[in-house]
Design a protein with these regions (language model features):
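N-terminal beta-propeller domains
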Residues: 1-117, 155, 174-246, 333-349
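Beta-sheet-dominated scaffold domains
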Residues: 2-4, 223-362
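A short beta-strand motif characteristic of beta-propeller blades
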Residues: 43-50, 119-124, 162-168, 214-220, ...
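Repeated scaffold domains used in trafficking and secretory/extracellular systems
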Residues: 52-61, 96-136, 169-182, 225-229, ...
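Assembly/oligomerization scaffold segments
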Residues: 65-68, 130-132, 137-141, 149-150
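Beta-strand initiation motifs
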Residues: 86-89, 160-165, 206-213, 253-258, ...
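Hydrophobic or amphipathic alpha-helical targeting/insertion segments
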Residues: 88, 139-164
Length: 362
């Protein structure tokens, strides 16, 4: 006699196999979609030309003539793939070379003098300078870009034969850049201030000094942490620090943007660990996952979080990268496991079916 097994979709990897009785406990390169188990499709090569170093930022869009543009930032270079044109190097002149790997701060000068008592063993809380990452967005058909170890804002004016150049008058020593729905260019961690957000005049990317005749301005998020990321969601700018979340809303003259705390104890684990759908943002924190849909940040119950965070290479966590696969209602996080210094694993969340899956890429 055959007995039909009613196994719920998704993986359960928190705890023992005994505790997961009646659930799937392991998988690789499969997904659950509409309550059915399906294989994950393969990958397709976009170009046979390899980069000289590792890609750490990417943004795709269409220009005003409906030509596809894909901007890719690597540790030391900036490239564009243009419709009908091969890879073009648009690296700006004088850019600061970045880091391929997170670097330990345990050397001389890496910590505060006198922080611990003499003769007492130090706690195991080694700190790391994060890997270089890029933020890239389009301002109309042009692209604005910034690398974390360089900090300047560059603009590429939609010409594959021309390199990107420094955006005139923009602040330096930034953590990132984005373009708001109202068409302000906005810098995160502006001028080296870890909590400062600064924006240009509306529709005028080179006007940054506030005046009665323009809408340029700035604010500081009310956080005890440092800004790591920002993303546009539901008409707001969601700013994520390493401890909290903040929603910036456009209010017009005279302040232009106001802020509200959208969550505490929900800091993001890396600068690229957030992705957005049309209605919500999802990100990975230090030990859990979070969602923001325009109200307040809520933690996402995960059936695989113990597995993921226990095998994560903490020293290289700044390489974690999130993407949305809208076709299957999924948010994916790619991360390096404890046996690798580069990304070799993934965890994916189906935000419609509320299911999880994991796997490896190598």
């Amino acid at each position: 006699m055959l007995i039909k097994l009613e196994i719920p979709p998704g993986l359960y990897k928190n705890g023992t196999e005994y505790q997961a009785a009646g659930r799937w406990t392991d998988a690789n390169l499969v997904r659950w979609f509409e309550n059915t188990l399906r294989p994950i499709g393969g990958w397709q090569t976009m170009s046979s030309t390899q980069f000289s170093d590792v890609a750490r930022g990417m943004h795709g869009y269409f220009d005003n003539s409906n030509n596809r543009r894909v901007i890719v930032g690597t540790t030391s270079n900036l490239y564009v793939y243009a419709e009908g044109v091969s890879q073009s190097n648009i690296t700006p002149s004088g850019i600061v070379t970045g880091r391929n790997d997170a670097a330990s701060q345990v050397g001389y000068g890496g910590q505060l003098y006198g922080e611990h008592a003499y003769g007492v063993a130090r706690p195991d809380n080694e700190q790391y300078d994060p890997v270089t990452t890029w933020t890239i967005d389009n301002f109309g058909e042009d692209a604005v870009c910034s690398a974390t170890t360089d900090g300047k804002i560059y603009i590429w004016e939609n010409n594959p034969s021309a390199i990107a150049t420094v955006l005139t008058n923009a602040p330096t020593s930034n953590q990132g850049v984005l373009v708001t729905d109202e068409r302000f260019v906005m810098c995160l961690g502006a001028g080296g201030n870890p909590r400062k957000v600064q924006w240009s005049d509306q529709e005028a990317a080179t006007v940054w000094t506030p005046a009665s005749t323009n809408a340029a301005g700035s604010l500081e998020v009310a956080s005890d942490g440092k800004i790591r990321a920002g993303i546009v969601v539901r008409g707001q700018v969601l700013v994520l620090t390493d401890t909290s979340a903040h929603a910036l809303s456009y209010v017009g003259t005279p302040f232009y943007y106001t802020q509200e705390t959208a969550g505490s104890n929900c800091g993001i684990i890396s600068a690229k660990a957030v992705a957005v759908t049309g209605t919500a943002a999802f990100w990975m924190g230090e030990k859990s996952f979070f969602r923001y849909d325009g109200g307040y940040t809520v933690p996402i119950k995960s059936d695989v979080s113990d597995f993921v965070f226990n095998r994560l290479n903490q020293s290289q966590r700044s390489k974690i990268w999130a993407v949305i696969n809208g076709q299957y209602n999924e948010c994916w996080w790619f991360y390096p496991s404890s046996s690798s210094t580069e990304i070799d694993s993934y965890v994916a969340y189906n935000f419609v079916d509320d299911t999880w899956t994991v796997g490896t890429l190598a």
